[in-house]
């Protein structure tokens, strides 16, 4: 994680940050336009279970489908590829779809090596999560202004979001490290098993 942060804050590579911004734009647009619909889908355990199952099946074949990777670093990454990866990332707005997996698959589809696709996915998570948190806070403020204006609530929100952000970043880094070493198959089997178990639980009431 420390190594990734050093790369992230290497301000000598300004073009890298512009490419990250380009990659975040699709999520910002779709998140703004369809946030209410996404919240509705989150309330459906059947949608989550189904996407976990179907997504797991897709992951079993990813390493075989996307081959001949030629993009090894951000200097070889075009803005078009960054935006396309960002579009893939928006699939994570569907409940049950992994953001990291979606963006890594998008990277591999755009000829990134699995290692660089994982690295770019990690970097892309930072502005994406910050933007999502900021939007939710703004939405909460519009609905209930006292949430933000109260000092006690503001401190609680700040601590809660900071802890959630740190835990999410660590979890993403672990997940990406796992994918770099083992590929998508094991994660695919896990999602299939979890999806089947959830569907059985839903069916049995």
Which ranges hold each PLM region?
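Multi-pass membrane proteins that catalyze or facilitate reactions on polyprenyl-/lipid-phosphate substrates
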Residues: 1-205
């Amino acid at each position: 994680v420390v190594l990734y942060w050093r790369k992230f804050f290497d301000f000598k590579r300004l073009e890298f940050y512009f490419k990250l911004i380009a990659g975040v734009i699709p999520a910002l647009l779709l998140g703004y336009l369809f946030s209410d619909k996404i919240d509705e889908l989150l309330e459906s355990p059947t949608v989550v279970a189904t996407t976990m199952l179907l997504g797991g099946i897709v992951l079993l074949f990813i390493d075989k489908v996307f081959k001949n990777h030629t993009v090894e670093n951000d200097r070889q990454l075009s803005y078009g590829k960054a935006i396309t990866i960002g579009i893939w990332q928006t699939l994570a707005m569907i409940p049950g779809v992994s953001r990291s997996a979606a963006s890594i698959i998008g990277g591999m589809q755009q000829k990134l090596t699995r290692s660089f696709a994982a690295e770019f996915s990690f970097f892309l998570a930072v502005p994406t999560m910050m933007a999502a948190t900021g939007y939710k806070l703004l939405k909460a403020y519009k609905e209930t202004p006292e949430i933000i204006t109260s000092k006690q609530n503001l401190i609680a929100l700040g601590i809660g979001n900071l802890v959630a952000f740190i835990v999410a970043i660590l979890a993403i880094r672990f997940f990406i490290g796992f994918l770099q070493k083992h590929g998508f198959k094991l994660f695919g089997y896990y999602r299939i098993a979890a999806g089947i178990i959830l569907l059985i639980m839903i069916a049995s009431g």
